From Swiss-Prot:
Compartments, as annotated in UniProt: Cytoplasm; Nucleus; Cytoplasm, Cytosol
Binding residues for S-adenosyl-L-methionine: Y320, K329, Y330, E388, G414, D415, M416, E440
Record carries keyword Lyase: no
Gene Ontology CC annotation, any one: methylosome
Name of protein: Protein arginine N-methyltransferase 5
Recorded superkingdom: Eukaryota
Amino acid sequence: MAAGDGGRVSSGRDVACVTEVADTLGAMANQGFDFLCMPIFHPRFKREFYKEPAKSRPGPQTRSDLLLSGRDWNTLIVGKLSDWIKTDSEVSRIRKTSEAAMQQELNFSAYLGLPAFLIPLKQEDNSNLSRLLINHIHVGHHSTMFWMRVPLMAPNDLRDDLIENEPISLSEEDNSGEERTWIWWHNFRSLCDYNKKIALAIEIGADLPSGHVIDRWLGEPIKAAFLPTSIFLTNKKGFPVLTKVHQRLIFKLFKLEVQFVISGSHHHSEKDLCSYLQYLEYLSQNSPPPNAYEMFAKGYEDYLQSPLQPLMDNLESQTYEVFEKDPVKYSQYQQAVYKCLLDRVPEEEKETNIQILMVLGAGRGPLVNASLRAAKQAERKIKVYAVEKNPNAVITLEGWRYEEWGSQVTVVSGDMREWKAPEKADIIVSELLGSFGDNELSPECLDGAQHFLKDDGVSIPGEYTSYLAPISSSKLYNEVRACREKDRDPEAQFEMPYVVRLHNFHQLSDPLPCFTFHHPNKDDVIDNNRYCCLQYRVDLNTVLHGFAGYFNTVLYKDVTLSICPESHSPGMFSWFPILFPIKQPIPMREGDTVCVRFWRCNNGKKVWYEWAVTSPVCSAIHNPTGRSYTIGL
């Protein structure tokens, strides 16, 4: 379907009936609309499939496909199911007729090659509707998407009877009204087994549900948003505008690249219909600009990536290059080394006290450069060892040493755990952290290297903590499900973590700390196996699809880095969150407690995670013995 160019808003016009489809399409295009939502059959033409003589009525059932080119049908028309069709009617005759009519309309839309077909959800029980649709999807090989039109609030929940300025009571019954239409949608997509061809077209009314309910909707696969003309207000110049609350919702929908559909009759007689589009364009141009992190992550939204395993694999040059561009991480490392040098070397010793600094996992040298800058800033002397196991990156380090660093830096090619250091270090600096903190085996690496750290030596970072938060996301659940590999267990893809820029999701509760590691590790017996039990309260009806993982780290004293949402280091993009999926979505009721058990396991050769939900219901333990995913030591 036609999408907006660049940042332009993609918009459509919803019409109840079309007499001349080509003329109407042309008129809509002149107004600035990108596509047309229209009935494929005349809305009042109730076909008869069982009784004569109506059953055998001669003549075409609807207009010919020759009225438009195939390209126009494929890109500019969204079909609509006839309103009179009631596939879940308790009256047998109505149900059977509706089934046949729906089948006819679905087949004809597939024949036309429509990009999308609109089906309204008007009640909680849509079992037969879901059966008909999923059968249609499985029988054919068509590319049509199915947009389920669902109001954010059911019509009888709209608060027309509220007295102006009267305080609104938030009793349990009042809140249940906000839940109703989401339950329609959730039941429907569950019956259709989260099929990727079924998406959501929300209808935005004059009244909106509460903020946390809207946030839940934003975790659903929304493709379109219907804006009735009746919800627009009129400003002093006669132009249509929306309330501030509606504007905030529109801004959030822009981020999801939702297409907007204007429905209803023209309520601003002095202005053309295009004034509604002009207003949406105005909102788009005045929406909050993306920050540095969002700019960097553009195109990676909800794209699953396997976590890096730099201990087992040698990284490519381009991978190093991406991480080296981070404007925040290395300035924070520089600040940490700077403060550490000032603490360790008094002013009167700055000419004689040479600190031994070892960069463990030097890569292509960004930490070496940051440390040298810190020493210059602090006016302290350092001797640097740059230890790197990747022989390809060592070539780059030797180039740096030859051209820039000179004898101040010694390049060591080898594994830090096996290196026999000629002297002990005052400071060891490393960047071995993954999206979950310890998932790139920083604990094992630094524990193996701390024997060449002086007794009073400092590790940068000094500690790091992983965090977990329960999330709901149909999009991510389907993305994980699609990762099935031919020769593996059919559910193995649910037993491994993924690095992902979380976008189309809803976080159900605040992150809680999971595992913490300190360096240097002073324990008598070093054991990096871990277990934790985390509990979260859920404040609304929803579905659990997995857990988002984050971390924060203390580099040195008050110098920190974080990817936790509430404390994210501004402008830092070196790490996306990590996702731990679960095999089966778990429905959650308002007030439920999510309890998740998490293990970090190590058998001397590999490290892996195991996880299980134990409340409100028990899931299977995911990834036992590391059968689906391990991290090689």
